[in-house]
C-alpha cells in the first residue's frame, strides 16, 4: 500500500513539473567579460548534431567579479525528466542526485540538469545510451556551456566538468567520458557496466524488469522508443537473447569501451547496491577495475539498496518504492559517511582542488570489513559433489557449502563451475546464495538476489558474445550476484535452487530435475577478530 501511494505522489509531481514551461534564454556574454553574477536558473533548448532539440535547465551560481566555477551536469533516471526547478520537481525535492546538484549550485557550481532525448522536454527517440545519440548529446551540451556560460573554471582539458546521475543517467556518464576528456569527475550511481549481461544474465531476459522499463519508457513517455529498441524489446518476449539484441546494445555499455582500450577518462566515485536486482553490485566492481587499469582514481561505495523489483521487493520506510540508496554508510575503516556530503566533497576535491575533510577508502561497503577491490575476489574453492535436485513450486533445494565455526563476514561475488545432467534441455534453474540459520533452521536468500541458469541458453549466450561456435562444455561458468552479510557461529552458507523466481515471471515450469556437480569459489570469510583489528 505504501509503495502504491508513493507511486501516485510521483505521478502527481511529474505532472506538475511538466505544467511549468517558461523558457528564459541566457544573456550572451563575451569570453573576456567578467562581472558579479546573481544566483538564478533558466530554461534552454538547443539542437543536437542530428537536429534533435535537447532541453535543459541552467543553474547559475552567485559569483563575484573574476571568480570562476566548475560545471556539474545532472541528468535523470529512465522514464523521468530533469530538475526543471529547484523545488517543484521530483529531483528538486526528493531524489538524492537532484539534492546533490542543488547543493552544488548553492555552493558555487554551475549546474546543468538536462532531459535525455525522448524524455521530458527533449525531442527524439530513446536509444538506450547510444554513443552516437545520447552520449553525443552530453558533448553538445558541453560545447554550448563553453560558448555561453561566463566565468567557467578551466584547466588543460577545457572546462572543469563533473557529472552525476543514477541508473540510466549513470550509463551515459561512462560512455560520454570515454568520448570526451572534458568530463573529469563522474558519479555513476546504481548503473550498468554491461547492459546485455544485466538485462539477460546467462542469456535469460529479466522479463519483469524489462516489461516495467517498456511501460515507463514507451508508454509513460508515449511512443518514445526507437524502432530498433522496440524490436529488441519484442525479441525478449521469446525469453532468450538473440544476436539482434546484442548487436543493437553492445556499444551502449562501458564494457565495450573498456575491452577496446578506450575506457572512461574521468576519475569516478561509483555507488552500487547489493539488493539491486537490475544492476547488481558486480557491475560497479567491473567498472572500478576498468578505471583502475586505465590509471584513473576511483572509489567504489556499496550501499544496501538500488533498483527494487516493483511490488516484489520493498524499500525501508521513508524511502522511494522502487529505488533507494540510503543517506549514510559505515565503512570497513569504522568511519561513517554522509553520502550527499561525501559526493560534494569529492567534487570539491576533483574540480576545485580542495582537500577532503575525510579520507574515503578505495572501497567503502556499508557494514563490511572490505576496503580494497582485491578483497572482493572469490578465493576459496569448494567442491560440489554430484547431487540429485528436484526443486518445485513449493520446495526449494539447499546445497550446503560451508559452516561457520565463529562469527564471520563475507562480501563479494561467487563463481560457479557447474555441470548439469537433465532430460529437459530447456530447464532453467534459479540459483541464490543463502544462509541456513543454526538457531532456527530456516533459509535466508542473501540480499534477495538470484541468478537464472539454463545450460542451453547459456551456451547460446556465450556464442553470441564471443562470436564463436563453441562446443558443448561439461562445465559452464556462472558468476553469482555479490552478497554482503555476516554468519553467526554454526550458520551454513550454501546454494538455494528454485524452479521459479518472482523476478522472471515469464519462465513457467512447475518442477525441474537434474544431477548437478562442479565447484564454487567464495570470497574471503572474515573473522570478527580480523574486522576489529582493521
Segments from the language model and where they lie:
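Glycine/threonine-rich phosphate-binding loop and adjacent beta-strand/alpha-helix elements that clamp
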Residues: 20, 24-30, 40-45, 352-534
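Short beta-strand/loop motif that positions the catalytic acidic residue
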Residues: 264, 270-272, 276
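N-terminal cap/lid segment of alpha/beta-hydrolase-fold proteins
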Residues: 29-67
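Catalytic histidine neighborhood in serine/cysteine hydrolases
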Residues: 291-316
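Short alpha-helix in the alpha/beta-hydrolase fold that links the catalytic acid
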Residues: 280-290
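Accessory cap/linker subdomain of secreted extracellular hydrolases
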Residues: 94-100, 106, 135, 147, ...
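Alpha/beta-hydrolase active-site loop
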Residues: 129-150
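Short substrate-entry loop that stabilizes the transition state in hydrolases
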Residues: 65-69, 77-107, 112, 117-121, ...
